[in-house]
């Protein structure tokens, strides 16, 4: 992180107050804002454009693996949710409930009337309502596998909200599949986890750990839950996506049955998997700096911005014509399988002001063009992965020919930077005392100062006792983020001395 004494566009800096820095970046980058509805946010065009690119890429990945999109009701009858006991217990405290079906004007006010015979739950997730449809759609083994994805919004009441990370309403995709056999369903679960990991690393430049959740962190009603976990710059973990093997639990609750090849009636094996707009929060906290957002080129709404520098009215037409031609040339190039996204900022503002706006938005490449640059047949280029004042003159032809390689170079640099940061703050720990010391924050200078950044990922042996896990969470606010899928050496639990099959990832988290 940068020296807090240096002049930056965002204050406080990450080192001074990471939580406040995060909110200031969202504001400065014009990503989102709070709404009048408690716990909900307005996603502004720049933030929504990021989500649209996430959707576009993931949708292609899903369809390439045989999945199709559908849409299911926002409202779930209470009786459906009650069919899966563990599921309803896990979500009960977060559910928004609709109890009336209309409003009536009384004494100048609107009053809810017409109580529903059965309350409706605003979907917190859709396993039960989709399961009802699957029960109608699946009759024979020939109907399987059933591979469905839904792009939707969900509502989960949150007491402590933070934009993009935890909001009462958020956008996501949720995949739901049904299979004839247990191995097929497990393969699907792991395939989708792999797709999430590939998307995170290749498109978001976000290094992740793939692993399984412990019993206490498992999705309500699932047999096994898998996840991808990433480290943010404050060294906390963020769960970036989950994939659940549901066994036959939801199939039995919803009545998803089919006749197999022998004519025997049996329950299907199901999965579900999801990823949400919290990925934008992950992007901010992984790549952002003290000057604002840093967008990975592959997902940036605009990959290149051209900023005309016009100090005299008489050169305006010449500079804009040159910039317009450059824009067309750059858009004719391709990067990551699509035309390069280029924006010409022709607003009547000072060049420096425009440049700083695009720095704060995180646009990967900035090109400043004035009369002198035109005379030289060049542009003045700045990269968002470097300091704002690190700019260089680049010949126009060289820039156009190499823009795809330049964007990939920035993408690779962001991924490598994130990997280096994670490696620097991942520690192998063998004793309880060392573990507690690692996650105990250093003292603050003043009583109301924010907690200093500390800790990271701890790789420690754990025998799996839920009571031990709960005690550590209570003491330190630390949880098992996942049991890594990679093979590990057996050892001794750092907390109980009992045998442990492998090390697990511990961290404080969002």
UniProtKB/Swiss-Prot annotation:
Chief place where the protein resides: cytoplasm
Q: Which GO terms describe its molecular function?
A: ATP binding; proline-tRNA ligase activity
Q: Kindly list the places in or outside the cell where this protein is found, as annotated in its UniProt entry.
A: Cytoplasm
**What organism is recorded for this protein?**
Anaeromyxobacter dehalogenans (strain 2CP-C)
- The answer to whether keyword Aminoacyl-tRNA synthetase applies is yes
Under the heading SMART domains, the entry gives:
ProRS-C_1 (SM00946)
Cross-referenced PANTHER family, in alphabetical order?
BIFUNCTIONAL GLUTAMATE_PROLINE--TRNA LIGASE (PTHR43382:SF2), PROLYL-TRNA SYNTHETASE (PTHR43382)
Which GO terms are recorded in the biological process aspect for this UniProt protein? Answer: prolyl-tRNA aminoacylation
From the Swiss-Prot or TrEMBL record, give the protein name.
Proline--tRNA ligase 2
What keywords are annotated for this sequence in UniProt? Aminoacyl-tRNA synthetase, ATP-binding, Cytoplasm, Ligase, Nucleotide-binding, Protein biosynthesis
Q: GO terms for CC?
A: aminoacyl-tRNA synthetase multienzyme complex; cytoplasm
Per the record, the similarity remark reads: Belongs to the class-II aminoacyl-tRNA synthetase family. ProS type 3 subfamily.
| Domain of life of the source | Bacteria
User: What reaction is this protein's catalytic activity?
Assistant: tRNA(Pro) + L-proline + ATP = L-prolyl-tRNA(Pro) + AMP + diphosphate
Indicate yes or no for the key word Cell inner membrane: no
State the protein's purpose: Catalyzes the attachment of proline to tRNA(Pro) in a two-step reaction: proline is first activated by ATP to form Pro-AMP and then transferred to the acceptor end of tRNA(Pro).
Show which residues constitute the signal peptide: none
EC primary class: ligase
A Pfam family per the record: tRNA-synt_2b
What InterPro entries is this protein classified in?
A: aa-tRNA-synt_IIb (IPR002314), aa-tRNA-synth_II (IPR006195), aa-tRNA-synth_II/BPL/LPL (IPR045864), Anticodon-bd (IPR004154), Anticodon-bd_dom_sf (IPR036621), Pro-tRNA-ligase_IIa_arc-type (IPR004499), Pro-tRNA_ligase_II_C (IPR016061), Pro-tRNA_synth_II (IPR017449)
